[in-house]
C-alpha cells in the first residue's frame, strides 16, 4: 500500500528535523485520520525515528524520537506557563535554574540583573525570598566561587539610578579606571574592586558615557577588548547594548544546528521582553540590521504550529 501524500509530507518534515514546535493541525488531519496500515507505512518510512525489530515483527520508536517529540510539544506549554507567571517570579526561577546548572549558565544571571529595570530586579529578589526562603544574593554567594562571585552578587544587588543626569567627568574617570584594568588584567579585570564597583553601582546612562570615553581613550571598542566568553563581556554587552545581546541569542536559538539548551533561549527572550514595547522594538530593529530579515519572518520560517503563533502574537504586542 502506498503512503498517502499527506503522510509522506509529514514523514519528510519529521525526518528532516526542520524547525521547532509541532504543526498540531497537520498531525490531527493526517495521523488522526490515518488507517492502521498507513501508520505502519509511516513508521517504516521514518527510519530516523523508528527501527524495525525483525525478530518480534514490529517497528519501535527510538528513545531519542520520544524525547524529541516531548520536547517539541512542550515548547508551547512552557511559553504559556512562563508568560502567565508574574515577571518577578519568572526571573527568580530563571536565576535559580542557572545556579542549579552551574557555571555554564551564569550568563543568565547576568542577563536578568543587567537588562531589567531597578524595580523589576528588586521585585525578582523579593520573589526569590518567597519562593526559596533565602535571598538571591545569599544563594549566589553559596554556589559561585572565585572572582565571578563578587561580580554576580554585586549585579543582582544593584538598584541603579534611572534618571537622566550624568556627571561626565565622573564617567570619564571611570573609563580611565576600566581602560587600565582591562589593559593590565584582561579577563581578570573582573577581580578588581573598582571594576566591580563601576559595573554594579553606576546608572546605565553613566555607563553609556563611560563607553564613549573608553573608546576615545583607547582608540578601540571596549566590547572588543574583553573575551566574548567571559562574564565581564556578558555584563558589558547587556548593560551597554541589550538589543544587540538579545538579537544575537535569538539568532543562535533559531539556528538549525542549535543544541537543546540554546533553542530554549527563544522562549525566554520572547516572554520576558514582550511586555516592554520600546525594548522589543529595539530588538526587532537590531535583528533586522544584523541579519537582513525581520524577526517575524525568521519565526515564520523556522517555527511551527501553536508555538509559532504564540511567539508571533507576543512579537506583535510592540507593533
UniProtKB/Swiss-Prot annotation:
The modification Phosphotyrosine is found at residues 159, 211, 287. GO terms for biological process: response to abscisic acid; response to cold; response to heat; response to osmotic stress; response to salt stress; response to water deprivation. Disruption phenotype: Plants are hypersensitive to osmotic stress and abscisic acid (ABA) during germination and early seedling growth. One of its GO terms (molecular function) is calcium-dependent phospholipid binding. Keywords: Annexin, Calcium, Calcium/phospholipid-binding, Metal-binding, Phosphoprotein, Repeat, Stress response. The modification Phosphoserine is found at residue 277. Gene3D superfamilies: Annexin (1.10.220.10). One of its GO terms (cellular component) is plasmodesma. Induction: Up-regulated by salt, osmotic and oxidative stresses. Up-regulated by abscisic acid (ABA) and salicylic acid (SA). Down-regulated by heat shock and dehydration stresses. InterPro entries: Annexin (IPR001464), Annexin_repeat (IPR018502), Annexin_sf (IPR037104). The modification Phosphothreonine is found at residue 115. SUPFAM superfamilies: Annexin. Ca(2+) binds at residues 19, 21, 72. Annexin repeats lie at residues 1-75, 86-157, 169-240, 241-316. Expressed mainly in roots and flowers. Lower in stems and leaves. Belongs to the annexin (TC 1.A.31.1) family. May be involved in osmotic stress and abscisic acid signaling in a calcium-dependent manner. A pair of annexin repeats may form one binding site for calcium and phospholipid. This is Annexin D4. It comes from Arabidopsis thaliana (Mouse-ear cress).
Amino acid at each position: 500500500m502506498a503512503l498517502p501524500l499527506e503522510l509522506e509530507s509529514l514523514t519528510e518534515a519529521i525526518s528532516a528535523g526542520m524547525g521547532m514546535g509541532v504543526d498540531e493541525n497537520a498531525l490531527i488531519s493526517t495521523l488522526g485520520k490515518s488507517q492502521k496500515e498507513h501508520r505502519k507505512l509511516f513508521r517504516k518510512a521514518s527510519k530516523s525515528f523508528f527501527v524495525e525489530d525483525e525478530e518480534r515483527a514490529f517497528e519501535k520508536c527510538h528513545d531519542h524520537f520520544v524525547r524529541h517529540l516531548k520536547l517539541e510539544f512542550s515548547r508551547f506549554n512552557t511559553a504559556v506557563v512562563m508568560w502567565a507567571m508574574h515577571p518577578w517570579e519568572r526571573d527568580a526561577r530563571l536565576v535559580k535554574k542557572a545556579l542549579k546548572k552551574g557555571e555554564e549558565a551564569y550568563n543568565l544571571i547576568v542577563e536578568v540583573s543587567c537588562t531589567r529595570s531597578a524595580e523589576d530586579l528588586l521585585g525578582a529578589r523579593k520573589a526569590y525570598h518567597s519562593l526559596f526562603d533565602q535571598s538571591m544574593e545569599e544563594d549566589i554567594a553559596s554556589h559561585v566561587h572565585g572572582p565571578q562571585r563578587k561580580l554576580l552578587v554585586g549585579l543582582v544587588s544593584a538598584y541603579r539610578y534611572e534618571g537622566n543626569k550624568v556627571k561626565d567627568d565622573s564617567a570619564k574617570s571611570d573609563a580611565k579606571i576600566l581602560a587600565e584594568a582591562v589593559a593590565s588584567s584582561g579577563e581578570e579585570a573582573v577581580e578588581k574592586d573598582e571594576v566591580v564597583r563601576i559595573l554594579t553601582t553606576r546608572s546605565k546612562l553613566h555607563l553609556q558615557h563611560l563607553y564613549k570615553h573608553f573608546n576615545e581613550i583607547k582608540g578601540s571598542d571596549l566590547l572588543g577588548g574583553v573575551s566574548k566568553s567571559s562574564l565581564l563581556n556578558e555584563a558589558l554587552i547587556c548593560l551597554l547594548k541589550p538589543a544587540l545581546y538579545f538579537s544575537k541569542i535569538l539568532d543562535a536559538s533559531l539556528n538549525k544546528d542549535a543544541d537543546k539548551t540554546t533553542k530554549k533561549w527563544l522562549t525566554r527572550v520572547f516572554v520576558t521582553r514582550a511586555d516592554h514595547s520600546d525594548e522589543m522594538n529595539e530588538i526587532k530593529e537590531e535583528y533586522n540590521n544584523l541579519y537582513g530579515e525581520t524577526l517575524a519572518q525568521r519565526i515564520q520560517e523556522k517555527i511551527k504550529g501553536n508555538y509559532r503563533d504564540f511567539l508571533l502574537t507576543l512579537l506583535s504586542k510592540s507593533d
